[in-house]
């Protein structure tokens, strides 16, 4: 689970982010996976899963993300975009770093209960936290993801 607030001094750049997110391929828009002259993802005979390795090394996560059919489209409100989305096993920290390099301002949180980690990314810094008990989870993440209800639901299922 990821929550992201994006802003930029240039309204056109912020609209570019909205359009990329709503197209469903925001990482690919800003950090495209290398392709050959035919537009196909480059295949490496030494690494049959080159796309996977490239994505994790550059985006920070296995798959791209963007608007899903069950999400509302991203919009600009008060000079920023606020979205929530899912990624596979890790947050897109490499992608956030690239946006920061392009003068976007990023404020993000992430929570991965299956792997017992969470974190806060702000001003180009990632505060990654592995937790063994719920007391280690920062209050901001606890509140943002409604973790009281989440953990009560998990306990009911056990």
Regions found by a protein language model. Give the residues of each.
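Intrinsic low-complexity, intrinsically disordered or marginally ordered coil/linker segments
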Residues: 1-158
């Amino acid at each position: 689970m990821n929550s992201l607030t994006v802003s930029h001094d240039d309204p056109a750049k912020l609209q570019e982010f909205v359009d990329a997110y709503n197209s469903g391929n925001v990482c690919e828009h800003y950090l495209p996976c290398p392709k050959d002259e035919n537009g196909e993802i480059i295949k490496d005979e030494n690494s049959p899963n080159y796309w996977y390795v490239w994505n994790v090394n550059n985006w920070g996560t296995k798959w791209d993300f963007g608007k899903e059919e069950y999400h509302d489209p991203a919009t600009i409100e008060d000079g920023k975009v606020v979205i929530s989305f899912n990624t596979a096993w890790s947050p897109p920290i490499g992608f956030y770093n690239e946006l920061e390099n392009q003068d976007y301002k990023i404020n993000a949180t992430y929570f991965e209960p299956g792997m017992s980690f969470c974190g806060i990314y702000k001003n180009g810094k990632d505060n990654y936290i592995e937790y063994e008990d719920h007391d280690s989870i920062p209050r901001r993440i606890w509140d943002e993801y409604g973790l009281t209800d989440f953990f009560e639901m998990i306990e009911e299922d056990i």
